[in-house]
A protein has these predicted regions:
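N-terminal leader/targeting pre-sequences
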Residues: 16-65, 70-171
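Bacterial N-terminal signal peptides that target proteins for export
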Residues: 1-6
């Protein structure tokens, strides 16, 4: 094997940190809001100071990005997802791109639906936790939006209607 190929393979493996079996975790089962079809499962795993978010969502608009956020209230009773209130923001930060250190705790990457309307996402985030504390996502709402997040419009990113809703539970 050529040294450059070996180096690339080793770098790729180094980035694949496995999830410890005893890692604190939470889970959310997304259900469609009124007149929508989106549904799926999202798992949250505490790995050190970061949380790995693993999402599998179906029933989305094909070949489109969909805003994806943790919301303040763990309440999907309204039928349209509005009962989850605004983005989870315990540190009183502005809405921003998920890679910014100055953002809502609930700001996450957009879900990118494939040609069949399915989206998968796996990312490590450093602002939220699964363990108890002010930035814990447990008991919060989780929303998939109809439109992409522009990562700048305050306070929501102009992500549109709420297609699916879940309450994040310890899991």
């Amino acid at each position: 094997m050529r040294p450059a190929t070996l180096a690339l393979a080793l770098a790729a493996l180094a980035g694949c940190q496995s999830i410890p079996s005893d890692a604190p975790r939470a889970t959310a089962r997304l259900e469609p809001t009124r007149n929508n079809k989106a549904s799926g499962t999202v798992n949250f795993y505490q790995i050190g100071s970061k949380v790995r978010v693993v999402a599998n969502v179906s029933g989305l608009t094909p070949n489109r990005e969909h805003g994806f956020h943790v919301h303040e209230a763990g309440d999907c009773s309204s039928g349209d997802g509005m009962s989850t209130k605004g983005h989870f923001n315990p540190l009183a930060k502005p809405h921003a791109h998920y890679s910014s250190s100055d953002r809502h705790a609930g700001d996450m990457p957009a879900l990118k639906a494939d040609a069949s309307g399915n989206a998968k996402l796996e990312i490590d985030l450093d602002v939220i936790t699964v363990t108890p504390g002010p930035t814990s996502v447990v008991g919060r709402g989780l929303i998939v939006h109809a439109d992409p997040d522009d990562y700048k419009t305050q306070p929501t990113g102009n992500a549109g209607a709420r297609l699916a809703c879940a309450v994040i539970g310890r899991g």
